[in-house]
Amino acid sequence: MVVEKRNPIPVKEAIQRIVNQQSSMPAITVALEKSLNHILAEDIVATYDIPRFDKSPYDGFAIRSVDSQGASGQNRIEFKVINHIGAGSVSDKLVGDHEAVRIMTGAQIPNGADAVVMFEQTIELEDTFTIRKPFSKNENISLKGEETKTGDVVLKKGQVINPGAIAVLATYGYAEVKVIKQPSVAVIATGSELLDVNDVLEDGKIRNSNGPMIRALAEKLGLEVGIYKTQKDDLDSGIQVVKEAMEKHDIVITTGGVSVGDFDYLPEIYKAVKAEVLFNKVAMRPGSVTTVAFVDGKYLFGLSGNPSACFTGFELFVKPAVKHMCGALEVFPQIIKATLMEDFTKANPFTRFIRAKATLTSAGATVVPSGFNKSGAVVAIAHANCMVMLPGGSRGFKAGHTVDIILTESDAAEEELLL
């Protein structure tokens, strides 16, 4: 077997090569309740103002501000209540001299009124109340169009539909939404040493953990996943299953078979399917032998058989590819700063990614490596919610150093409730 030449490239360049490929998914229409985590296929433009009318943000009384002038603790001014309305109701009364309408949160401001007095700012007595301070025009009023005006772009094409976007779409009556179809993913674990989850352990064998992990990572993105039978180290069967997966899926992910061992056949498989290898070595640890190929608008990811390296490869390279195929506005991993709370003394000839646990505090984010951090480690992944990114050419970092982290989970818990 001829060992393929590998020239390492930086992580950023590897991601850029992925997103430079011409690969896009078609637009489809889905029900609003099925649109979460999809990418919008078009701008959403406001068809009316929000709020649609001047409304009260509080429970209280709608008054004419001019009638409140001169009010003080020594000169309380009295108002007569002429009507009572709740949200969804409109008063048919015109508020006149020293008159008021009892109004609930969200209700439309009645004609004649231009300020709202909160209940707690009054002393009530039957159908009257008094106030002890003056109010200005439009005080305590949410004005028509103050949030959004007709014609404003309220959601952009390429934006991820999150729960907030769902609320906006519902507000403007989108029972169906035009989105980009999400790619389907094939997951193929390779290696004669692999056993299925329910198999009894044998000497020299390990259970397939990467396949279920990748499936979970893909399903977390809302992707349709096809799981293929674990492949033994055989070139012909490997070519056959990859070809089959390419016919049915937009992305094919294999784990294992990407190194330079006697039974690592992935380079030969890529040649057989006429895929262009975008890169086959990345200047990083773990996952340096991560390989990505491309053919006919489809991505083929060769991730390491080592669990931590496999996880890192998915986060750094598969996620951006999925976002790119769906036309997302942001495709690169988002990086934030955090304070390292433990020494990490290992030298880093290449960019190193460490599984870690981030915590949000009043002073900012802190991060602690999550246990054993070799490429074959699996338990550390379960206790991590981020990856620390240490630059190449460094000789370790002391506690207190500011580092870059990539959040991989949304459970970066607060150390304390920040009020």
Where are these regions (language model features)?
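Helix-rich terminal scaffold detector
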Residues: V3-V11, A175-L303, P307-G313, L419
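Structural signal for hydrophobic packing residues in well-ordered secondary-structure cores
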Residues: V19-P26, D43, I109, L155-G158, ...
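Solvent-exposed alpha-helices and their adjacent loops that cap or buttress functional pockets
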Residues: D54-S56, A71-Q74, D92-G96, I109-N111, ...
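Short, hydrophobic/aliphatic alpha-helical segments
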Residues: L36-D49, V90-R102, V292-A293, G297
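Short, low-complexity N-terminal leaders and the immediately following helix N-cap/first helix
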Residues: M1-N75, A328-R355, E416-L419
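Short, glycine/charged-enriched hinge/interface segments at domain edges or termini
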Residues: V2-K5, V11, R17, F61-K232, ...
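Flexible glycine/proline-rich
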Residues: I28-E33, E42, G88, T148, ...
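Generic structural signal for well-ordered, non-membrane alpha-helical segments
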Residues: N7, V11-I15, I28, L32, ...
